[in-house]
């Protein structure tokens, strides 16, 4: 189901359309969008990319379907926010994609990649990013997810999906902006967005798959030291692990020193 089938108002900022002068404010960060694709398919890729850069006035806003419609494959895109409210600038968003609802053929070698940008249909960071695949058993086709940390100056997200050759999209997701900014011109948002995304690693923090996020530090318990972000998902239960102690905690998996020391006769 292509994005063109969705109905809504045409692209607009809080008050003005996006000007061509401002539309490439952070394009200096755009890398070679096709470098992950096989060279033998390069011609196909160039043709496919061109279809994602439709004029902004043709990109209709995508309305949130019901989860049942998405799950059954009658709607290609679904999303949910951390607070249950509509997508809002400065908040977090999880995007779901069901290829069964589109004409995009799954490519087992490549998977599905996300291509999207804020306030314009150009990928933040340069190239499509692989989405996390979630298998649903033999009866249902897999779905794919992507995490979005919406910049404070983003008014919308324009995005497409690719299997490495073909594309589905573009779609446009509109964001709510703070009340104090609702009458600001689009130049205000684009300049602020350019400043936000010019920081090192900003694009990687804004759009990322679940599988690529590895914590760099862990919550410490008492004086324990946990090395490596790959161990942060452990359920640490501190307690006495001495089975001979009256303070033994059978659920503990980290000794926190709570077992009382037994002094020998020589120490007394």
UniProtKB/Swiss-Prot annotation:
InterPro entries noted in UniProt: RCA-like
Entry annotated with the keyword Transit peptide: yes
Transit peptide: 1-49
Pfam family, one: Ig_PIFI
Compartments, as annotated in UniProt: Plastid, Chloroplast stroma
Record's keyword annotation contains Plastid: yes
Gene Ontology BP terms: cellular heat acclimation; chlororespiration; nonphotochemical quenching
Top-rank lineage group of the source organism: Eukaryota
Mutant phenotype after disruption: Normal growth and photosynthesis in normal conditions. Intact NDH complex, but altered NDH-dependent chlorophyll fluorescence increase after turning off actinic light and lower capacity for nonphotochemical quenching in high light intensities, due to altered nonphotochemical reduction of the plastoquinone (PQ). Increased sensitivity to photoinhibition and long-term mild heat stress.
Assigned keywords, A-Z: Chloroplast, Plastid, Stress response, Transit peptide
GO cellular component: chloroplast; chloroplast stroma; cytosol; thylakoid
Task performed by this protein: Required during nonphotochemical quenching. Involved in NAD(P)H dehydrogenase complex-mediated chlororespiratory electron transport which mediates electron flow from stromal reductants to the plastoquinone (PQ) pool during chlorophyll fluorescence increase after turning off actinic light, in response to photoinhibition conditions (e.g. high light intensities), and upon long-term mild heat stress.
Protein name: Protein POST-ILLUMINATION CHLOROPHYLL FLUORESCENCE INCREASE, chloroplastic
Native species: Arabidopsis thaliana (Mouse-ear cress)
Lineage: Eukaryota, Viridiplantae, Streptophyta, Embryophyta, Tracheophyta
């Amino acid at each position: 189901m292509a994005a063109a089938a969705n109905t809504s108002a045409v692209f607009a900022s809080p008050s003005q359309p996006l000007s061509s002068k401002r539309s490439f404010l952070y394009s200096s960060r755009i890398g070679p969008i096709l470098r992950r694709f096989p060279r033998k398919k390069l011609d196909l890729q160039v043709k496919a990319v061109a279809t994602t850069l439709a004029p902004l006035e043709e990109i209709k806003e995508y309305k949130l379907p019901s989860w049942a419609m998405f799950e059954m494959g009658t709607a290609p895109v679904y999303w949910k926010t951390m607070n249950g409210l509509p997508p809002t600038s400065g908040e977090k968003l999880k995007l779901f994609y069901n290829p069964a609802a589109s004409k995009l053929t799954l490519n087992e070698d490549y998977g599905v990649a996300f291509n999207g940008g804020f306030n314009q249909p150009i990928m933040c960071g340069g190239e499509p990013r692989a989405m996390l695949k979630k298998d649903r058993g033999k009866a249902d086709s897999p779905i794919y997810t992507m995490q979005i940390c919406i910049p404070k100056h983003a008014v919308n997200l324009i995005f497409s999906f690719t299997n490495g050759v073909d594309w589905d999209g573009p779609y446009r997701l509109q964001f709510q902006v703070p009340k104090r900014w609702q009458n600001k011109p689009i130049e205000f948002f684009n300049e602020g967005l350019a400043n936000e995304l010019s920081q090192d690693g900003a694009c990687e923090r804004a759009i990322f798959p679940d599988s690529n996020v590895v914590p760099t530090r862990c919550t410490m318990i008492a004086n324990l030291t946990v090395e490596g972000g790959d161990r942060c998902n452990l359920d640490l239960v501190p307690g006495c692990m001495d089975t001979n102690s009256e303070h033994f905690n059978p659920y503990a998996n980290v000794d926190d020193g709570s077992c009382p020391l037994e002094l020998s006769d020589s120490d007394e």
